[in-house]
């Protein structure tokens, strides 16, 4: 069994090019740190959602460290990191607008 995470990121003032670029960098970093798949979903004018899949709980837990580091960047983002559960696979029902990896 793996872990799927879904993480909302609200950017005060809207999704600027800088905010989207930072989100891309975070997604690529997640992939480097063990995520098997990472998707970025636009939700409204000021919110992005990461949908990420991990092979095990230990690799998923490292996500929090990566996200906290990203929050110290120049672009202010409010992260909701409290989601994650063991699953056998994704349900495929998300409206995925942009596949990053």
Locate each region found by the language model.
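Topology signature of small-to-medium multi-pass alpha-helical membrane proteins
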Residues: 2, 98-101
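Active-site-flanking beta-strand signature of metal-NTP-handling nucleotidyl enzymes
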Residues: 2-10
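Short, surface-exposed ligand-recognition loops at beta-strand->loop->(often short) alpha-helix junctions
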Residues: 9-21
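Short hydrophobic/aromatic beta-strand micro-patches
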Residues: 10, 51-53
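An amphipathic, aromatic/His-enriched active-site/gating alpha helix that lines ligand/cofactor pockets
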Residues: 25-37, 53-90, 101
């Amino acid at each position: 069994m793996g872990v799927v995470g879904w993480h909302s990121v609200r950017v005060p003032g809207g999704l600027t090019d800088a905010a989207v670029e930072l989100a891309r960098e975070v997604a690529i970093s997640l992939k480097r740190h063990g995520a098997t798949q990472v998707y970025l979903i636009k939700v409204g004018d000021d919110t992005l959602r990461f949908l990420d899949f991990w092979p095990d709980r230990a690799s998923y837990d490292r996500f929090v460290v990566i996200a906290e580091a990203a929050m110290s960047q120049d672009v202010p983002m409010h992260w909701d990191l409290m989601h994650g559960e063991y699953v056998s696979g994704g349900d495929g029902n998300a409206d995925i607008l942009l596949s990053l990896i």
